[in-house]
């Protein structure tokens, strides 16, 4: 029987399409601006995700000795610096394709997208829970 849940690839594509729609609206991108913006931003996102994957979760700190904690702190700040460097590089590249006002709105678009996505995920979880409860009552 086919699952009602989309696979991770389909889910990623839907999230990407939702990001494009929200950013395009919030930043008020023209077709020409969007054509220049998205390739730059997508590369930035991939690089940023790669940096974030390198960071060890802090919930492992209790099992570390002092030297490992010191190394964790050092690596954590190196990764944060790398993220900052990526963001600076992004802004330099975006200056060639977007006006400053739209670049300045990018953090707003990112925040609103994240908040909206989290809310959509919560709503979907609640709907699934309600369906399960409803299905259980019919048995």
Predicted region positions:
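Boundary of Sec targeting at the N-terminus
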Residues: 3-5
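Amphipathic, charged alpha-helical segments and their helix-to-coil junctions
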Residues: 84-139
């Amino acid at each position: 029987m086919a699952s009602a849940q989309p696979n991770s690839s389909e889910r990623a594509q839907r999230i990407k399409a939702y990001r494009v729609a929200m950013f395009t609206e919030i930043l008020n991108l023209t077709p020409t601006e969007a054509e220049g913006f998205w390739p730059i931003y997508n590369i930035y996102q991939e690089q940023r995700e790669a940096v974030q994957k390198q960071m060890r979760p802090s919930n492992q700190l209790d099992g570390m000795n002092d030297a490992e904690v010191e190394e964790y702190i050092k690596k954590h700040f190196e990764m944060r610096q790398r993220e900052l460097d990526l963001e600076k590089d992004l802004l330099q590249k975006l200056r060639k394709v977007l006006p400053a006002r739209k670049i300045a709105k990018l953090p707003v678009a990112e925040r609103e997208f994240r908040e909206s996505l989290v809310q959509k995920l919560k709503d979907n979880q609640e709907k699934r829970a309600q369906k399960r409860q409803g299905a259980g009552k019919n048995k």
